Structure formats: structure tokens, C-alpha cells
Amino acid sequence: MYAVLATGGKQYRVQEGDVIYVEKLNADVDSTVELNEVLAVGTEEGIKVGAPVVEGAKVVAKVAAQGKAKKVVVFKYKSKKDYRRKNGHRQPYTKLVIEKIEA
């Protein structure tokens, strides 16, 4: 069984036991979160596609870690004008372990 869920403006195809990195969620490490925005659920019988979400479906995941991704460097310049700007940031993420898919 698999599910397609949406969180943080992105979509993820997950199965039980998968590890995914999503945009930061406000949850403590080792707590469980319920992701209710399930767009599709696939089983042996077929696929259930929501409009826009599947009614009564949810994905239960455990928060494994909170962290920051590698630094993204943004460098702007204008040629021949001695204009240089270097910025960077580290995007916060949440590491989730998918425990259960309920449909």
C-alpha cells in the first residue's frame, strides 16, 4: 500500500517504513504527526484518487529529527560593473519515518 501526500507545498509518494525529509513541521522529536492531506491511496485492489483529498485517509509518521539542510549559496553580479552580492541560507527540515497509512 502506498499514499501520495502533500505537505509544505510538495507532494511525496510514501509507503510504510519510508524516511522522507519535509519542510519544517512544528513537532517535537520522537512525537507522532498525522498528515491528513492524502491525495491518493494505492492498494492491491486499485487506486483511490481524491478530489482534492481522499476522505478519511491519513498517514501517521514519527518525527525522527529536526535539522537544517546544506547551505544554498546565492551569488548575484553584474558584469564589468564590480557589483557582487553573496547570500546564503540553510533551509530547516523535518525527518519523518512513515509508520502507518490509513485509508
UniProtKB/Swiss-Prot annotation:
- This chain belongs to which protein, by name? Large ribosomal subunit protein bL21
Extract the InterPro entries matched here: bL21-like, bL21-like_sf, Ribosomal_bL21, Ribosomal_bL21_CS
Q: Cellular component terms, GO, for this chain's entry?
A: cytoplasm; ribonucleoprotein complex; ribosome
Pfam families linked to this entry: Ribosomal_L21p (PF00829)
GO terms, molecular function:
rRNA binding; structural constituent of ribosome
Species assigned in the record: Clostridium beijerinckii (strain ATCC 51743 / NCIMB 8052)
Q: Function, please?
A: This protein binds to 23S rRNA in the presence of protein L20.
Q: Which keywords are on file for this protein?
A: Ribonucleoprotein, Ribosomal protein, RNA-binding, rRNA-binding
Q: Which proteins does it associate with, and in what oligomeric form? A: Part of the 50S ribosomal subunit. Contacts protein L20.
A Gene Ontology biological process in which this protein takes part is: translation
Q: Family assignment? A: Belongs to the bacterial ribosomal protein bL21 family.
* Chain segments annotated as coiled-coil in the UniProt record: none
